[in-house]
Amino acid sequence: ISCSLVGSEMCIRDSIYCGDPVFNAIMGETERACREHKIDFQYDLEIPQKLKLDPVAVCSILSNLTRNAVAAAEMTERAEEFLTVKAAVKGDYLHICVENSRTKKAPKKTERKGYGLEILRDLVERNHGQIDIQPGEGSFRVDVTVENF
């Protein structure tokens, strides 16, 4: 399923993004947050059925990725805000790619911020996966691959 959501336009019905109910719940939360903050939200999901991966792991990894991305995109200039989620099951693995706009200046660290990537690395490692982090000039991309068996 592919979709692009700009502003408050919706092109899906009943918040069914893919075949996995946990993924659907997190994507619905992400879509609502993007609409609320006027972030251009796009996704491309190839998940035809319920994942074999532990639902708590799916929830933890995907919600960490998307919440961090929404928070970073919010700090971008209004005309440039975007968030893209791509995910697919290929063989015995789940691949997730989240890319978001980001400000060119690093935000000031606050007391409780800055642990998102550490938490994500731990979650991915515990699920026998790999993570690739690619900070770009005006964007930030995280690719995660975890076992789905």
Pin down the residues of each PLM region.
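Single conserved hydrophobic/aromatic residue that forms the stacking wall/gate
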Residues: 1-7, 11-12
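Conserved short strand/loop->alpha-helix "switch" segment adjacent to the catalytic nucleotide/phosphoryl-transfer site
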Residues: 15, 19, 42-61, 111
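Short beta-to-alpha transition helix within the HATPase_c
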Residues: 19-37
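A short, flexible helix-to-loop-to-beta junction within the catalytic ATP-binding CA
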Residues: 70-78
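Short beta-strand/loop element within the Bergerat-fold HATPase_c
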Residues: 80-92
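Glycine-rich/acidic phosphate-handling loop/turn and adjacent ATP-lid/helix
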Residues: 92-121
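Glycine-rich ATP-binding loops of the HATPase_c
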Residues: 128-141
